[in-house]
């Protein structure tokens, strides 16, 4: 089994006084489900944002499937941010089409199957859904990719 994520000597902070990671080293093998636990402000979201390329480490390296974080790694990572980010005026079916166009590994059948199981009508706009159903749609979209790494930031918050 190969390593999915390799983090080596990572340093990350905010400003001069807030160091989040000093010398972070971490190896995550394929085929595992890993949860990050810790109090608010402990660096969970910072680590997630570095994994998906939204933040850069000051020092050290992060490799996913052998590649530095960048276009090659983004092609194999499916990311669920902590906040809903979809345009509320889109129909869910339009969202599926956007994901299908944008991600080569998006499985449209999987998305519609999950919607059916959760009684979510793909012809509804997101605006008409409850907050919980909006979050379910976002999770469906992320999990309908055939990614090698799923990164979920506060999926059950």
Mark where each language-model region is.
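Catalytic Walker B motif of ABC-type/P-loop ATPase nucleotide-binding domains
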Residues: 150-154
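A short, flexible loop at the N-terminus of ABC-type nucleotide-binding domains that lies
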Residues: 1-23, 30
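Conserved ABC transporter NBD signature motif
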Residues: 60-73
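ABC nucleotide-binding domain signature
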Residues: 35, 77-82
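ABC-family P-loop ATPase nucleotide-binding domains
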Residues: 83-141
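Conserved signature/switch motifs of ABC ATPase nucleotide-binding domains
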Residues: 144-147
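Helix-to-loop junction immediately C-terminal to a conserved catalytic motif
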Residues: 52
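The feature captures the beta-strand-to-loop junction immediately N-terminal to the Walker
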Residues: 37-39
């Amino acid at each position: 089994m190969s390593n999915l994520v390799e983090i080596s000597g990572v340093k990350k902070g905010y400003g001069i006084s807030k160091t989040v990671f000093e010398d972070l080293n971490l190896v995550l093998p394929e085929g595992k489900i890993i949860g990050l636990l810790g109090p608010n402000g402990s660096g969970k979201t910072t680590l997630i944002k570095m994994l998906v390329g939204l933040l850069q480490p000051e020092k050290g390296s992060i490799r996913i499937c052998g590649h530095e974080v960048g276009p090659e790694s983004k092609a194999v990572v499916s990311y669920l941010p902590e906040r809903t980010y979809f345009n509320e005026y889109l129909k869910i079916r339009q969202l599926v089409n956007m994901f299908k166009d944008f991600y080569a590994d998006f499985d449209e059948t999987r998305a519609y199957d999950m919607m059916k199981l959760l009684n979510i009508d793909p012809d509804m706009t997101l605006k008409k859904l409850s907050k919980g159903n909006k979050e379910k749609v976002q999770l469906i979209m992320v999990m309908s990719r055939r990614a090698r790494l799923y990164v979920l930031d506060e999926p059950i918050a």
